[in-house]
From Swiss-Prot:
Family as reported in the entry's similarity comment: Belongs to the universal ribosomal protein uL1 family.
Name listed for the protein in its UniProt record: Large ribosomal subunit protein uL1
Cited Gene3D superfamilies: 3.30.190.20, 3.40.50.790
Organism expressing this protein natively: Mycoplasmoides gallisepticum (strain R(low / passage 15 / clone 2))
Gene Ontology CC annotations of this record: large ribosomal subunit
Function field: Binds directly to 23S rRNA. The L1 stalk is quite mobile in the ribosome, and is involved in E site tRNA release. Protein L1 is also a translational repressor protein, it controls the translation of the L11 operon by binding to its mRNA.
Pfam families the record matches: Ribosomal_L1
Record-linked InterPro entries: Ribosom_uL1_bac-type, Ribosomal_uL1, Ribosomal_uL1-like, Ribosomal_uL1/biogenesis, Ribosomal_uL1_3-a/b-sand, Ribosomal_uL1_CS
Keyword field: Repressor, Ribonucleoprotein, Ribosomal protein, RNA-binding, rRNA-binding, Translation regulation, tRNA-binding
Length: 226
């Protein structure tokens, strides 16, 4: 049985034309106005790509430092032999094999792991623990690096990871309901430009199929693709 729409959702859907494609700034304004949550909504972007994600070279993954930080504070675990540098850069937890053993024992009170390449052999053994939660460090996201301090600083300033899902979609929060619309536009364009630059050479035809923005639990608003 189809779920009945709430009055708020019906009102939100009735306030704009869901079939129309809007300029990015207008779409963001609509997304803000159609938010239906009692708490402050985030503004999210969804980019649908023409990718065959069964092929490794068409699985996009990486990280981006948006022009305007909209990330919640995160807990950073640094597994490194550069412990003084990691602490100075702002890591919440620092260690080596001791921290890996804590993870094996069930400790998961962190949001990102940044590590040196030398520790990836041991961390790789935790694939069944870290993989499903998206916590396995990866060179593509800058979380496997020799420059621990720089990586920690970037993530502390709001660096965000992105990756395609099974259907070739990329989702990211690019602002909050209270964020200035121009700042959200700049964040969204930064992500769109990066995704355009990452187009796999094997992709034929239209690469970006559609873009939409929405508030938390709000309706999607279609965006013009430039």
């Amino acid at each position: 049985m189809a779920k009945k729409l709430t009055k708020k959702t019906k009102a939100a859907l009735g306030s704009f034309d869901p079939k129309q494609i809007y300029d990015l700034d207008k779409a963001i304004e609509i997304a803000k106005k159609t938010a239906t949550t009692k708490f402050e909504s985030s503004i999210d972007i969804a980019i649908k790509l023409n990718l065959d994600t069964t092929k490794a070279d068409q699985q996009l993954r990486g990280a981006i430092s948006l022009p305007h930080n909209v990330s919640k504070p995160i807990r950073i675990l640094a597994i490194t032999d550069q412990q003084a540098e990691a602490k100075q850069a702002g890591a919440d937890f620092v260690g080596e094999i001791d921290k890996i053993n804590e993870i094996k024992a069930g400790w998961m009170d962190f949001d990102v792991i940044i590590t040196n390449p030398k520790f990836m052999i041991e961390l790789g053994k935790l694939g069944k623990i870290l993989g499903p939660k998206g916590l396995m460090p990866n060179p593509k996201t800058g979380t496997v690096t020799q420059d621990i301090a720089t990586a920690i600083t970037e993530y502390r300033k709001g660096k965000k990871e992105y990756r395609t899902d099974t259907f070739g979609n990329i989702h990211m929060t690019v602002g909050k309901q209270s964020t200035d619309t121009n700042k959200i536009v700049e964040n969204a364009n930064a992500l769109i430009d990066l995704i355009k630059s990452r187009r796999p050479s094997a992709v034929k035809g239209v690469y970006i199929q559609n873009i939409s923005v929405s508030s938390t639990m709000g309706p999607g608003v279609k965006v013009k693709i430039n």
